[in-house]
Amino acid sequence: MSEVKYFEDTDYGVIEAIATIDNGDFGTRTIRFETGQLARQADGAVTTYLDDETMLLATTTASNQPREGLDFFPLTVDVEERMYAAGRIPGSFFRREGRPSTEAILACRLIDRPLRPTFVKGLRNEVQVIITVMSVSPEDSYDVVAINGASAATRISGLPVSGAVGGVRMALIADENHPEGQWVAFPTAEQQKASVFELVVAGRLVERKRGNKTFSDVAVMMVEAGASENVVERIKEGAPAPTEKTVAEGLEAAKPFIDLLCRAQEGLAQRVAKETREFPLFPAYSDEVYAAVEKQASKKLTQLMTIKGKNERENATNDFMVEVEEKLIGRFEDDLGAAVASKEIRAAYNSLMKKIVRGKILSEGFRIDGRGVSDIRDLGVEVELIPRAHGSSLFERGETQILGVTTLDMLKMEQHIDSLAPVDTKRYMHHYNFPPYSTGETGRVGSPKRREIGHGALAERAVLPVIPSREDFPYAIRQVSEALGSNGSTSMGSVCASTLSLYNAGVPLKAPVAGIAMGLVSDEVDGKTEYVALTDILGAEDAFGDMDFKVAGTAEFITALQLDTKLDGIPSKVLADALEQARDARLAILETMAEVIDGPDEMSQFAPRITTIQIPVSKIGELIGPKGKNINALTEETGANISIEDDGTVFISAASGEAAEAAIEKINALANPQLPKVGERFLGTVVKATAFGAFVSLLPGRDGLVHISKLGNGKRVEKVEDVVTVGEKLQVEIADIDNRGKISLVPVVEED
């Protein structure tokens, strides 16, 4: 049974809240929040444990003074992975931790997204949340534990937040005892491998009314979801497919655990009893400024928001904003100052724009570009654009334009991950680039920002379940998505471009995948709450909506989902209908993609040809040779790259089939030898000259001797070197093989 217990050590000032999570047949997990022992000078510090081995220190600290001139809340979240957490020394040159790993950056985003909306609006003091990973079990992922730790530290910090955030990872596990699947909270790495689908869900507690009664409920704030790598095979075996219904069921299954974790944090905060501090708040604009802007701009702005083209609409609305500012600034600059008055007028103008668009969507089903609520923008699909790339594609959806590029290489080129994540290698790598010109702007170009890493991870998660196994396709795969134009969901465009590019590169995907971005707008209309789901949202609709979610999948099931909402809860039917609307769009996009390419093309002439052979494990050392002598010689002679796995699998990569065949022949001769027979002829190489004859190499590791008496073609030879030299090619025939395997050779005399 899931429950919360509290312990207090008054001697040391340590307070604990322990949440026990009951997974039924799959056992229990314990989340423990502890405060009072570590990092006492931080505004809030909580040590969070998952069972006994995973331990994180979460701290929240706020600056004393607000940052001047900011029009946003300066919250930063940092995850510090300490390699001592896994009993390892960092592999870097200086043997200390450097820049954060991809996994740490993704954990930062996972924490920031549900935590940021809980802060009071108008806060301008810098707030820094730092999670230090101090110990981690190889069986556990720390990211979801960090969501709870960061929330608990913030909740007891005295900062103005609306409440605690609870986060949980849910895995749908189907086995012989649970053929329909059971949702398991905080699954171990072993349970994750056995799962069909995973959800990371974060939410908070809200008060609801039903009649005269008030009760507490969980409002979902964020969802990250993905299918397992072997989901296609699991479905064939009878496991449930992760459909839209599965997602809805998983969200409901997560709510009791989120409720438990939030109650544990709230109980901890009550026992710490730190008062909420007073902070100056800076609302974006005053009511007077908004009223003036609304009166001045409402009518014309409503007309401008019907301009379909993004650039034309933005230019027109920006010009009109300058006009409105010039007319109104004189009214407010004496009281506010010119700079503040300008900022408030512009903020009020943007807020009015949002109100106009939302109102027309809810009352008329109006969209900025004239589409219906479920319409997809015009699609453009093309493959094979880049001459020397192994695979390439261009996917366009309205003004969003994504170039997908695929590169194939040997498995030794897969990414080796030096982080605290349970996974240590990555064979399929998806990298996403978002240059400033994609939105018609200038900006910094260089190492990827957190947003780019997050979008790449989402697209990677969407495509990974359909990537063929390393046995079926022994290649490392790097997929790059270049966002060349952006006006709504470049991440889902990247998923579509990836499918096209991978097919063009000859990758035999288990199924094609497409993605779509959805939005939801909600408000009171005539006393009733109305919800409108929008398919294929524009950038402006993303900013103006109450919820956005991105769904990727095949025609049969969902492979990835990401959801963020500002609402205090979404009715189950509204979410189910929105997911079904997304499925219809996904099927339409898949159909358009299939008209251009619906299966793997022939591999590019520039892509390496990789073949595999199996050798006995006992022969691995012999194939490598002393200090790599044999394998280096094979590489040099054939021009092929050779990689050997611990189980005796040998991967051979070559630019041509001839080079690969030559390498296979030589490897088999060495590691899978067949004894030569008497009478067989070879074109061998003289490798050694002695006083009694010449040794000739027939096969790698297999030499024979031509006696000096056989070298002269019937004539007496005084010195072997008078007839042959080391390195010379010599046609020989096996004359005899003795019982010790020693081979006697005779030169082959060409007949006239």
UniProtKB/Swiss-Prot annotation:
Main location group: cytoplasm
Reaction equation(s) it catalyzes: RNA(n+1) + phosphate = RNA(n) + a ribonucleoside 5'-diphosphate
Entry cofactors: Mg(2+)
CDD domains named in the record: KH-I_PNPase, RNase_PH_PNPase_2, S1_PNPase
Any GO BP annotation: mRNA catabolic process
PROSITE patterns documented for this protein: KH_TYPE_1, S1
Pfam families: KH_1, PNPase, RNase_PH, S1
Stored SUPFAM superfamilies: Eukaryotic type KH-domain (KH-domain type I), Nucleic acid-binding proteins, Polynucleotide phosphorylase/guanosine pentaphosphate synthase (PNPase/GPSI), domain 3, Ribonuclease PH domain 2-like, Ribosomal protein S5 domain 2-like
Record carries keyword Nucleotidyltransferase: yes
Annotated GO CC locations: cytosol
Membrane-spanning residues: none
Record keywords: Cytoplasm, Magnesium, Metal-binding, Nucleotidyltransferase, RNA-binding, Transferase
InterPro entries noted in UniProt: ExoRNase_PH_dom1, ExoRNase_PH_dom2_sf, GPSI/PNP, KH_dom, KH_dom_type_1, KH_dom_type_1_sf, NA-bd_OB-fold, PNPase
Subcellular location: Cytoplasm
Top enzyme category: transferase
HAMAP family with a match to the protein in the record: PNPase
Family stated for the protein in its record: Belongs to the polyribonucleotide nucleotidyltransferase family.
Protein name: Polyribonucleotide nucleotidyltransferase
Chain's gene name: pnp
